[in-house]
Amino acid sequence: MASEEGPSRSASPTNVDNTFPQYPPRAELTVAGPPSLISSRMTDIGTEDGQGSDTTPRGGGPSSANPNRRSGFYSDTQSRPETSGTGLSSRGPWAQSVPLRQQLTGKRGSIAGSIGSAGGRPISAASRSHVPSLTSHGFFRPMSSQKLQAQRGAGRPPTMNRPYVITGEAGARNSVISTGSGRIGAQIAEDAELRMPSRGTEMTEQETMERMTANTSPINGFFPTSSVTDSVRPLQSPVDARNINVEMNKDYREESPTTPPRSPTRTSRSFRSSFLMPRMNESGITGSNREIEGGEKLQSAASSPNIPPQSYERQRARFKRRAKRQNRANLGKNYEYFEGNTVFCLGGRFQNTKQRPINIATGSLIVLPCILFFIFSAPWIWHNISPAIPVTFAYLAYICVSSFLHASASDPGILPRNLHKFPPPEMEDSPTGPPTTDWVLVHSAEASTAAMEVPIKYCKTCQLWRPPRAHHCRLCDNCVETQDHHCVWLNNCVGRRNYRYFFTFVSSATVLALYLIGACLAQILVYKNQHHISFGHAVNHFRVPFAMVFFGFLTFLYPAALTGYHIFLMARGETTREYLNSHKFPKSDRYRAFTQANWLKNWFVVLCRPRPPTYYGFKVKYNQGDQRLGSHRRWQQPAVSDSKEGMEMQNVSPQLPQTGFMGPTALRNSNNGSTAEVRA
């Protein structure tokens, strides 16, 4: 071993308190033991008074001038056993050790740093049978919890932060393992000249773990100087003294996609590039690729720090371009994809059935007499009778026209399509067989309410189970909630959402017709009385007002009949369809399931209930994939092919008259062949 080649020195210190045993001279050692992997440092533990140990200088150099100095010198590495750190060094010993400090008094003098000299250690420490001696303080006086807590919370002793200069060729050594075994030069006063440690860490070196576990000191206030490697020294230094700060407000400069991301500038404080990465074993295989027998290797995705910051900017720009592209596409609104027999105008605000526009004639019959009244009757009545009559007539005309527009051009309560899609018909189903859909009677749980059960039906066109009181209109080709009837004068269905407007329209039209008759007759009679003329001369003077009297009387009859009829239906709690269908059954089997048992309550329920929202929202922007609507715009939809679903609401072109033989195909072909032969 290296310990046998070194010069002979004093092997053991003076034993004062019989703490350290006596060891034979080094020359007596003939056989050297193997290198010790764990350096025993329990002999470095000092006493509380600093005088319980040896006071004889070790090695006899300049240390003889300072008898109180115990282990403050660095000696050659041959006087200590080879560890995993010192065994790697091939440096020769110095002729004379250099003292770190000239004086050390008090309790500080009783501590021997782990970076200090090993020349005072017994020669038997290099043998295989060496057992480190324990002081009485370390063995019989264990550390209490308060001392342990104080030791953990205390700062590093000055011996750890003491700067030093490595002279000679030892000054270029950067290894954590070999730094402790090098020669330390003269002490300097500034911390700025401290050499940075190597790239090793506390958890990646085997010797570091041994030194941390074997060099614990039980004495309060003292710390083993080499229990922790030099890689943590920058962590123990004050932050302000070294001006260490982190800049978090830096922006990344824009780079081209082909430029690789820049790596941070390497400094002496940087970790190595392979930090915490698997090492290679003897066979050259990394730990991540080694064979694991009986285990399962889990796959993991790449970590986010590997993604350069520019990729996030590119992704955000890509999303913006996609959003702009979608906006440019302009998918349109819901009414453009509606599949019903409905026509829309003004961006989906007005809708009407795609049939003969009889509602235009109805509106004309309302607006035309109002215009004639304001031209030929209102000025004279304003000045000769009262201004209240024209104002009241204008208010009634406004209510009538407004309710007409709402009832004719609003959504009556169209139910959404494709809510309960029916499976497609199988090929083996017979087209002449019984229907697969029919009226279904939903039975209630209690037998006492059997009379109030109502049937519901599945609509094959709209592909949904219709709720009670809902029906499919064959003209609108829509299922309407609480449908009353399809009004040809409005060219729209009357359902739950526009029934109140319909009743207001017919009732206001009735009142407006009566008011028109009364105002025009009053104008003629007042003029006759003012001028004392006959009724014929007055009619000859106001011919247009007299014509409006007849027009008002004619237009009064039909709206008045509709008003009385719907007042009767509302009092019964029935719709027009329910009332007409009930006459198919005898009176003993007619039931009104939705009546409130009071005609006032029935009126209140119909006229004062809130208007439900629309199920479609035709003015809303279209979302691609909405199952209620089609996949193409109405004018871009392909032609409907003939199928087993029927021919409802499809335009069928008239068939041309066929000439020639209309028999079977075989006979037709044979007939054509014979005709060709005859012609030949």
Curated annotation (Swiss-Prot):
Q: Name one Pfam family in it.
A: DHHC
Which modifications occur after translation, per UniProt?
A: Autopalmitoylated.
* Residues passing through the membrane, by range: 362-382, 385-405, 502-522, 544-564
Q: Per the record, what ranges lie on the membrane's Lumenal side?
A: 383-384, 523-543
Q: Does the keyword Transmembrane helix apply?
A: yes
Q: GO: which molecular function terms?
A: protein-cysteine S-palmitoyltransferase activity
- The residues covered by the DHHC domain are 457-507
Reaction catalysed by this enzyme: L-cysteinyl-[protein] + hexadecanoyl-CoA = S-hexadecanoyl-L-cysteinyl-[protein] + CoA
Assigned keywords, A-Z = Acyltransferase, Endoplasmic reticulum, Lipoprotein, Membrane, Palmitate, Transferase, Transmembrane, Transmembrane helix
Q: Where is this region: Disordered?
A: 1-128, 246-315, 656-680
Note whether Membrane occurs among the keywords: yes
Q: Which cell locations does it reside in?
A: Endoplasmic reticulum membrane
**Principal location listed in the UniProt entry:** endoplasmic reticulum
**Which residues are catalytic?**
C487
Q: Name one GO cellular component term.
A: endoplasmic reticulum membrane
Record InterPro entries: Palmitoyltrfase_DHHC, PFA4/ZDH16/20/ERF2-like
Q: What is its EC number?
A: 2.3.1.225
Free-text domain note: The DHHC domain is required for palmitoyltransferase activity.
Question: Which function does this protein serve?
Answer: Palmitoyltransferase specific for Ras proteins.
Question: What name goes with this protein?
Answer: Palmitoyltransferase erf2
Species? Neurospora crassa (strain ATCC 24698 / 74-OR23-1A / CBS 708.71 / DSM 1257 / FGSC 987)
